Amino acid sequence: MARYTKAKCRLCRREGEKLFIKGDRCFTDKCSYERRPYAPGIAGRMRKKMSDYAIQLREKQKVRRMYGVLEGQFRSYFKRADGMKGVTGANLLMLLETRLDNTVYRLGFANSRAQARQLVKHGIFTKNGRRVNVPSMHVKPGDVIEVREESRKIPVIAEAQEVIARRGCPEWLEADGANFKGEVKAMPTREDIQFPINEQLIVELYSK
């Protein structure tokens, strides 16, 4: 499956804001976007006025890259969100938030979504007692995500309590770093997603 393999900080610079792709590094002065807050390339400093379509496209790319989802997957999520009851944009964000890799990241067991995806693929987590290794798997209220006993000495996992204390945990999740597990308490709401996203632009883009 194709994945973006170049410097991830370039993606933040391309979108003109932090996407927090590299986890804790994004909160330090080592963040590339902090040092060079303009698009990569020779003409990066000269941002042109964008058309409505370009603005919609950039918003879609921003969200897709933030969650580390491929274009085909993202379009599939939109179609699914559009067929659900409620507001399509909010439904889309809920589907992205309840991916297993994002849940692992939100619980503090990884420094970034990319790292969470890798850890899930290595099969170090269980969901309701069963080993899982599919990052795109969705979680629901009542699900318990736990680190397998033999994987608890992995440095990033061992530091989970510290990460949770520093970063916090969204209200729809309950993290128990001391016991290397977390529980899904409810489905995430739009208010649970603090990152500045204008999902209506994405809806308008796919509605053309």
UniProtKB/Swiss-Prot annotation:
Chain ranges of the S4 RNA-binding domain: 98-161
Leader sequence segment: none
SUPFAM superfamilies assigned: Alpha-L RNA-binding motif (SSF55174)
Keywords recorded for this protein, A-Z: Ribonucleoprotein, Ribosomal protein, RNA-binding, rRNA-binding
UniProt-recorded Gene Ontology molecular function terms: rRNA binding; structural constituent of ribosome
Keyword field contains RNA-binding: yes
Keyword RNA-binding found: yes
GO biological process: ribosomal small subunit biogenesis; translation
GO CC annotations, alphabetized: small ribosomal subunit
Name of a matching Pfam family: S4
InterPro entries, per database record: Ribosomal_uS4 (IPR022801), Ribosomal_uS4_bac-type (IPR005709), Ribosomal_uS4_CS (IPR018079), Ribosomal_uS4_N (IPR001912), S4_RNA-bd (IPR002942), S4_RNA-bd_sf (IPR036986)
Domain of life: Bacteria
PROSITE patterns per record: RIBOSOMAL_S4, S4
Function of the protein: One of the primary rRNA binding proteins, it binds directly to 16S rRNA where it nucleates assembly of the body of the 30S subunit. With S5 and S12 plays an important role in translational accuracy.
Subunit-structure text: Part of the 30S ribosomal subunit. Contacts protein S5. The interaction surface between S4 and S5 is involved in control of translational fidelity.
Family listed: Belongs to the universal ribosomal protein uS4 family.
Name of this chain's protein: Small ribosomal subunit protein uS4
Organism of provenance: Maridesulfovibrio salexigens (strain ATCC 14822 / DSM 2638 / NCIMB 8403 / VKM B-1763)
Gene designation: rpsD
